[in-house]
């Protein structure tokens, strides 16, 4: 049989190609609509950008919370170090005084320094408490991101359920097909997970897709 010769593309051949592509596209769309796949694909296409935006939101909230916590820790460290340094210095000076009591003038200076240190402690602790509160408040992102992630999981599970239903409703007849252990799953997913043949786990979904050749 003679093979048709390939001619250079001209305006007529280009128009013919475009027309054929249009016909194929229309046939594909009609077939998808007849099978009920157009709705599932449209929902999946809409869910993908939405899921991406939600994941970006989770990432941003997590990064902001981590940055707030780190900033609060860094701001608190100098105050903690100053209190630690002052307490150690005064403790050493008081130990030395008890070992060898010094003159009254030097004792007054030690007492004055101690009183000054004690007066500054509330300011340091107040600042540190404020930073700790900010760290705690930064963790409120978990509630928001948890809701977002749960919503995403609901959308994904719904898309999976609809696509699975489309497959189950359009399975071609195969009388010679070997009997499988999960044959009853071809009747479609059931809601009551206590019954036999219920698609109740991801493993069962995978087995069902394998049995369909996907």
Swiss-Prot record:
This is Protein phosphatase CheZ. GO terms for biological process: archaeal or bacterial-type flagellum-dependent cell motility; chemotaxis; regulation of chemotaxis. Its main location: cytoplasm. GO terms for cellular component: bacterial-type flagellum; cytoplasm. It is an enzyme of class 3 (hydrolase). It comes from Escherichia fergusonii (strain ATCC 35469 / DSM 13698 / CCUG 18766 / IAM 14443 / JCM 21226 / LMG 7866 / NBRC 102419 / NCTC 12128 / CDC 0568-73). Residues 176-199 are annotated as: Disordered. GO terms for molecular function: phosphoprotein phosphatase activity. Plays an important role in bacterial chemotaxis signal transduction pathway by accelerating the dephosphorylation of phosphorylated CheY (CheY-P). It comes from the Bacteria. Pfam families: CheZ. Residues 184-193 have a biased composition (Polar residues). NCBIfam families: PRK11166.1. The record marks 147 as: Enhances dephosphorylation of CheY-P. The keyword rRNA-binding does not apply. Homodimer. Belongs to the CheZ family. It is found in: Cytoplasm. Keywords: Chemotaxis, Cytoplasm, Flagellar rotation, Hydrolase, Protein phosphatase. Its EC number is 3.1.3.-. The gene is cheZ.
């Amino acid at each position: 049989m003679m093979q048709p010769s390939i001619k250079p593309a001209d305006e007529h051949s280009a128009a013919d190609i475009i027309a054929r592509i249009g016909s194929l596209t229309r046939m594909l769309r009609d077939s998808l609509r007849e099978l009920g796949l157009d709705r599932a694909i449209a929902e999946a296409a809409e869910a993908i950008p939405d899921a991406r935006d939600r994941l970006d939101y989770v990432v941003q909230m997590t990064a902001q919370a981590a940055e707030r916590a780190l900033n609060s820790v860094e701001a608190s460290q100098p105050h903690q170090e100053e209190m630690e340094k002052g307490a150690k210095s005064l403790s050493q000076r008081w130990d030395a005084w008890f070992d060898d009591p010094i003159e009254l003038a030097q004792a007054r200076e030690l007492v004055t320094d101690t009183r000054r240190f004690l007066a500054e402690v509330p300011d340091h602790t107040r600042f540190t408490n404020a930073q700790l509160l900010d760290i705690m408040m930064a963790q409120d992102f978990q509630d928001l991101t948890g809701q977002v992630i749960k919503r995403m999981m609901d959308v994904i599970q719904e898309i999976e359920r609809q696509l699975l239903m489309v497959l189950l409703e359009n399975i071609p007849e195969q009388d010679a097909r070997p009997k499988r252990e999960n044959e009853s799953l071809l009747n479609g997913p059931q809601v009551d997970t206590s019954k036999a043949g219920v698609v109740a786990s991801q493993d069962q979904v995978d087995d069902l897709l394998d049995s369909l050749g996907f």
